[in-house]
Amino acid sequence: LPIWIKQALIRDKRYPNLFLLPSAQTRDKTSVSPEQMKKLIEQLRDDFDYILIDCPAGIERGFYNAIAGADRALIVTTPEVSAIRDADRITGLLEASHIKNINLIINRIRFDMVRRGDMMSIEDIVDILSLDLIGVIPDDENVVVAANQGESLTGYHTPAGKAYENICRRIMGEDVPLACYPRRKSFFFRVADYLIHR
């Protein structure tokens, strides 16, 4: 690796094989081009088994920079109509950029609301987006607690912590079955399906 990349990498105190490459706080996203981002990822590939790129919200320069060097995408959405529409749009842009290996993560789902029909079910979301599901993260206050304490959620014996661990195992190629979740077609499914497929 070039010396400037080595100097920019921050090693995690708890996980010696985990590094973070933060973006510059003094520059905006237009300071880096998609071509430069692609070159950076190529330089990192030989030294790392997995490179996760956190994509900014919105579909602007930051989005195209983030996907420039990607060979796989994990779309994280929540069970809300507006979020599902955004995820559908992102899927189309990824496919247009020739990223075909796209998986879905559903975040902050509340099974009590799904049972009452007040929230789209996992089945609803997968039906609308037609993506392979790689994980479901239940709404869990421990996520907020861990984030505020600067701690990793893995190692917490919580539903969300277990969900993150299972997603990681699936990314690494393990066959980890998805749990059985409540299924119920909600009013929101019909609304989202109409808005996306009209």
Where are these regions (language model features)?
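Electropositive phosphate-/nucleotide-binding environments in soluble metabolic enzymes
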Residues: 3, 31-34, 84, 119, ...
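Generic secondary-structure signature for well-ordered alpha-helical cores
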Residues: 10, 14, 50, 130-131, ...
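Exposed alpha-helical structural elements
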Residues: 4, 8, 36, 121-124, ...
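Conserved catalytic-core segment of NTP-binding enzymes
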Residues: 35, 39, 43-46, 50-145
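NTP-binding/hydrolysis catalytic cores, primarily Walker-type P-loop NTPases
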Residues: 150-198
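Proline-rich low-complexity regions
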Residues: 22, 79, 138, 152-153, ...
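P-loop/Walker-type NTP enzyme "switch/lid" segment
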Residues: 1-46, 147-149, 154
